[in-house]
């Protein structure tokens, strides 16, 4: 698989939550307990939480009163509703108060603990970009601040509008639906048109192609070719294939597209013919519907052996003859790699049949429609640069499509845009100002604990044969650990060397800086076709609130952005940290052994290392997960989870919390059997607090429109299932809260893979 975004080009099958992936400093180990947390000794009586007895025996325990414990208590007071029965619906018990007190902001389509933390990081990055008290010593940091500042120049964007965009299109041979008779079909050249859109904005539309690690030999990179994405985004084919069911969304898409073309036509100084614009847009959507029938659904693209088809470069003309592939690649890659491309190198094609079908569709489609569509998609890459009236149109569409009530502040767009262009530079700024370096070692300690828990789970496993189990243990032991950030980003000289060749002139506009950064990035990664892969290269920006697993590196990554509340705080009870970041760590470790991660070996090569009988048993267990989640209906709707699409994330969720709980219990055994309880929550045992901590990560809500979209496109299950369905599979949860057998949170049937 190939992605053009992120620091290194690396195949990531997992991130802990959707967002629309070093070495560890030798720091002293952080203490597990502060000296002042064990203050008050209390004898408990039988207590209840809701209708559930949580203390049956008199026990002596302590209540912590440190600053960290007090803060953790205050946070939970805003989340838990202790009047509810945790055995009925744990999400409601652990999250209802938080959800009720944190309505979705008007400029967002969802709001959760994850979102709140991301919003915090965005605001922190804004402060850094807008801080003019000192001159940056790094050229890269100076450049990223220039990108932010030019992005924020809305007065200039409104004054220029779509003028630069339209002037550039003239050099491409005009836009039929905008320039009408100025476009000539006789001049249509698909290869040249795509060459222009890729060179300037990296818009290839019908396919993704570029350097990617060779899944069978991850020490090298090959050119990789994969299917493209529709106008509504990846995995949105269902909207086009069932227009009756998704009538609201498709009407909004049509209206939005018509509005944009109307504005483009006006800005080009051409006469607006409303009926002609509507006809052109209808032709485009009809074309997309045909294309949607060719695209393979993501849930059917989970066998990576089937997606690994090695061919020679010259074979492309056999599969997709409508494009001159040699001309296209030579015109969009740096001169340094031209000799390599002329050797007819090996390439990887994810789906040969897709290229063949796409070739037929393009050959049978009016060139006017193809040109209109490509330029419409290309123009979409200018959305932040062409002024308020286009942004207002986009907001109308976002309200219908995603339920977003108002456009987000400009500064959020610009923070995201700048960070996306120079992600290591943004990470450098964030780490220097906001990251506690001690968190790296504390996290490493927890990873060690989680890996030990996984090994113990593997040893206790009774369905794997000895040889497969032995190799699984080796893979777990050899998993690379990347925490916080790569060290080089804190060295100005090394950071600037990474971005060598990327420079902005003082007079550059935002659009010019965008194109320079895109062209630099593509040149940078294409040159890597000639270099061996550095398996140890950090796979994420530091200023990211997420976690990742890369199967082709067998690496887990925890950027600096996620190593904070509510996932982690060294001052909090370990129950909350193991339930929070501990479950995140376990989730990523488990991804190495989910339905897709298990297809790769200890160094990341695509290789079947499973005994056939053991593989069959794994598939049986996975099928249980698929069917279990497919039976989950979202509250208040008739929508159900796609169990096949979400199976990998569900396996990781279930395995991750099991590892985290075992690691926490092991920690308690090593430290006296219990830790101090939280003030105001003395009734919660250590084990119960662990599960509360796990649930906190997923407290949140989405608009109805976004729920629909994510059920179709997101490989993660909704928050309620990431709490309730996961915990129903954990007998330790039912034991901790003493849930009666047969109660909603203690069912008679459970699904367990790991």
UniProtKB/Swiss-Prot annotation:
GO terms for molecular function: metal ion binding; metalloendopeptidase activity. Its EC number is 3.4.24.-. Keywords: Disulfide bond, Glycoprotein, Hydrolase, Membrane, Metal-binding, Metalloprotease, Protease, Signal-anchor, Transmembrane, Transmembrane helix, Zinc. Zn(2+) binds at residues 587, 591, 649. Its main location: membrane. This is Neprilysin-1. Glycans are attached at residues 38, 81, 132, 217, 273, 303, 441, 612. Its cofactor is Zn(2+). Pfam families: Peptidase_M13, Peptidase_M13_N. The chain crosses the membrane at residues 5-27. Residues 63-754 form the Peptidase M13 domain. SUPFAM superfamilies: Metalloproteases ('zincins'), catalytic domain. The active site is at residues 588, 653. It is an enzyme of class 3 (hydrolase). Belongs to the peptidase M13 family. Binds 1 zinc ion per subunit. Disulfide bonds join 87-739, 95-699, 151-414, 624-751. The keyword Ubl conjugation does not apply. CDD domains: M13. It is a single-pass type II membrane protein. Probable cell surface protease. Required to control the neuronal innervation of pharyngeal pumping. It is found in: Membrane.
